[in-house]
A protein has these predicted regions:
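Conserved PLP-enzyme active-site core in the AAT-like
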Residues: 1-155
Length: 155
């Protein structure tokens, strides 16, 4: 498997004020590589393939490093009022050093804007939430993740 130079890609993306978003499906849900450690801003995983491991549930995971400045002027969905939330401006509420971040103990160099917007708007509009049973199945799959990754890596 060829692993991209995430640090170089992150530097290029950040020099242009855009986030580095990585599909880490082949990274075995972070068991093989953790792109955030190399500068990725957002990482997505297929929970179906590695976390579940048995094809019994369909799901995915979005992980936000909390490091990207979504308020840099290039992402109006974060910096302009949201009609669906009575004019809420996501960046004002959940950007660096926002009252919400302070209340939650988020370090001043981190933000939760991407995660908050995903929960507030995407979850509301598309309903992408796991059922309790599917969550249980994924937790069961996690119990054998390290063994499965070890065996796949040996093969």
């Amino acid at each position: 498997m060829n692993v991209p130079d995430f640090e170089k890609l992150a530097k290029l993306a950040h020099s242009n004020d855009i986030p580095l978003i990585v599909d880490n499906t082949l990274g075995a849900a972070g068991a093989i590589i953790k792109p955030i450690d190399y500068g990725a801003d957002v990482v997505v995983h297929s929970a179906t393939k590695w976390i579940g491991g048995h094809g019994t549930s369909i799901g995915g995971i979005i992980i936000d490093a909390g490091t990207f400045n979504w308020g840099n002027g290039k992402f109006p969905l974060f910096t302009e009022p949201s009609e669906g939330y009575h004019g809420l401006v996501h960046w004002d509420v959940s950007g660096f050093e926002s009252d919400l971040c302070k209340a939650l103990g988020i370090p001043s160099d981190k933000n939760i804007a991407f995660g908050i917007r995903a929960r507030f708007e995407v979850l509301r509009d598309y309903g992408a939430a796991l059922s309790p049973f599917n969550s249980f199945l994924f937790i069961q799959g996690l119990e054998t993740l390290s063994l499965r990754v070890e065996r796949h890596s040996e093969n």
